Amino acid sequence: MSFEKIDICDIKDSFTRLIRDDWALLIAGKADDYNTMTVSWGMTGELWGKDVVAVFVRPQRYTYEFMEKYGDFTLSFFSGEYKKALSFCGAKSGRDYDKAKECSLNAVELGGSVAFEEANLIIACKKIAFADMDPSKFLVPEIEKNYHNGD
């Protein structure tokens, strides 16, 4: 499958709606060493003169190790027919399952990163910064309900 390269500003759909409602698979690593997980939190914007994507990966997640090890990652967005696969990838650990195989997803190399051939939108990202979440800095009490067990 071939993908058409577009500027992130030319994505027709709202990123907020895409990540909140459709979710995405975050894939970190290289073709022979990667993991994926479902993400439904994230944002796009402008920072330091660059178009950026921010994603949030808990340290307990297997994918976190890949995010630390590699400088690139992708976000793969899918049509609704893949919602069950995204649910699986969010509930199961790559330590225990080959998620791509379990969900019949085909990994493809994309500029040194990995994405899934079945995606209808892929955002290729380069890690430029990272920060740990500090719950003591939460200002709105409702956030705690989404920060399960402090992770």
Q: Model-derived features: where do they sit?
A:
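Basic, polyanion-binding surface patches
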Residues: M1-D151
